[in-house]
Amino acid sequence: MFCIQCEQTIRTPAGNGCSYAQGMCGKLAATSDLQDLLIYMLQGVSVYATKARELGVINPEVDTFVPKAFFSTLTNVNFDDERIIAYAKQAAEYRESLKNAYEAACETAGKRAESLPPVAQFVLGTSKPEMLSQAPVALLNKDKNEIHEDILGLRLLCLYGLKGAAAYMEHARVLGKTDAEIAGRFHEIMAFLGEPSVDADKLFTTAMDIGQLNYRIMAMLDAGETEAFGHPEPTVVNTKPVKGKAILVSGHDMKDLELILEQTAGKGINVYTHGEMLPALAYPAFKKYAHLVGNYGSAWQNQQKEFANFPGAVVMTSNCIIDPNVGQYSDRIFTRSIVGWPGVTHVIGDDFSVVIDKALSLDGFQYDEIPHNITIGFARNALMAAAPTVVENVKNGSIKHFFLVGGCDGDKSERSYFTDLAKSAPKDSVILTLGCGKYKFNKLEFGDINGIPRLLDIGQCNDAYSAIQLAIALSQIFECDINELPLNLVLSWFEQKAIVVLLTLLSLGVKNIRTGPTPPAFLTANLAKILEEKFGLRNTTTVEADLKTMLNVA
């Protein structure tokens, strides 16, 4: 086992990364090894997908399968060995199909089929023990003693960034949005990473390419969500329980939320969003469901306590899931799509009867709690509509600064930095937030500036796209570069989606971003220095010191 993809990873003087019997996230060594093997198989598929594409052969099933299966290897997504093995076997079948199609296309074109790299020729074992014995072939740091640590760090930056992009591709696909050109570039990068490079410049360029690719993916996902559910609107949301039977929907998949709402209509069940699903409450399409009553709980890391106290059924539509046995609710939590946990019921297809039956069998909430409301829904359309008013308030001096404070949440005590930063932001500043990092402060009162709320919740982590559109619009209005705006980005990272959002921002030329609370363990000190020199990227320090720098206070 070697896994170093999330903030929780082990850090010691002897080296970084989880490499023992179990990772800090709860992932067993065998699961980690199988995930590495799956990635290796997917890279082999992408080699053939790329070569076949050069001859005009495109398999749309493969184009959607590879990102989806890759998504299953993200932090806190799938801990079920049998599901990972099934993905690996499916990858082997797709690779063989593409191999045949490629060779046939070569014959038709009168070309000789190329000799492809080992990753495209690897023969997957037929049993779990055999697959585990093959794991060293796919170990991410297998050649660590032969290469410079910066090369390994750059490879991992690319791999983990591409994982985040794969997740957004799958979210878009669920909403009917795919793009053959995006899929082709995705395969090219997967294939490149499958034949480990030692060229630092090429790896760095690839990291920026991944950021550019993800910008297009986020635009595609934004289109999928707004075409399906309308543009988010400023919406007041209750964050306290109401009396009645209950289902909690977590993750990011709004299509699943829609299906659950349709199937629970008239059955006396209240539906709540959780975590990154909170922004769904701002979409017009969901406002017709009176039994979508609000948001319950906070960010992913608190779920073992919050789910244990939730007297209903829970559905995990995507990341993040952690051990449900700790809170003894494994019999009433259900997984979907790429999510998996051993022993937890997995819902296949669009029928949520098993979830509904479980919710009806449970007590539900016995009384209404006193409401606590928050306002959400300041995504792209709402921000653009407010832009003239915002500009007027900037010009008259009422608004002097903007902060984008968001990203992933986590359980490290150092993350209180983000709460303290939001609290300490000057009263003449506006705070934009997105991702589950918002839960560090989204229930606090920040007031307004001439009717403009000082806290603007943009949405999910992928709604960084909305923030980028606002920044571009403001830079055009003020006729300046984005980096000349009175805007500072402070991003909390935990896993791979945050990595690819960061790469997206860097690839667009956004500078002087702060990230925290701790830098990714796979980034060497030298790589961190290079990123600081090139982009002004730096780690958070203290709220007082960072605010002085951001506000140019001497």
UniProtKB/Swiss-Prot annotation:
Q: Which residues carry this modification: Cysteine persulfide?
A: C408
Q: What class of enzyme is it?
A: oxidoreductase
Traced from the root, the source organism's taxonomic lineage reads:
Bacteria, Pseudomonadati, Pseudomonadota, Gammaproteobacteria, Alteromonadales
Designated gene of the protein? hcp
| Record Pfam families | Prismane
Binding annotation for [2Fe-2S] cluster? C3, C6, C18, C25
Q: Which PANTHER family match?
A: HYDROXYLAMINE REDUCTASE
UniProt source species: Shewanella sp. (strain MR-7)
Task: Tell me the Gene3D superfamilies matching this sequence.
Answer: 1.20.1270.20, 3.40.50.2030
Family that this chain belongs to: Belongs to the HCP family.
What is any one of the record's Gene Ontology cellular component terms?
A: cytoplasm
Q: Which superkingdom, per the lineage?
A: Bacteria
What is the name attached to this protein's record?
A: Hydroxylamine reductase
Which NCBIfam families did the record assign? hybrid_clust, PRK05290.1
Instruction: Keywords in alphabetical order, please.
Output: 2Fe-2S, Cytoplasm, Iron, Iron-sulfur, Metal-binding, Oxidoreductase
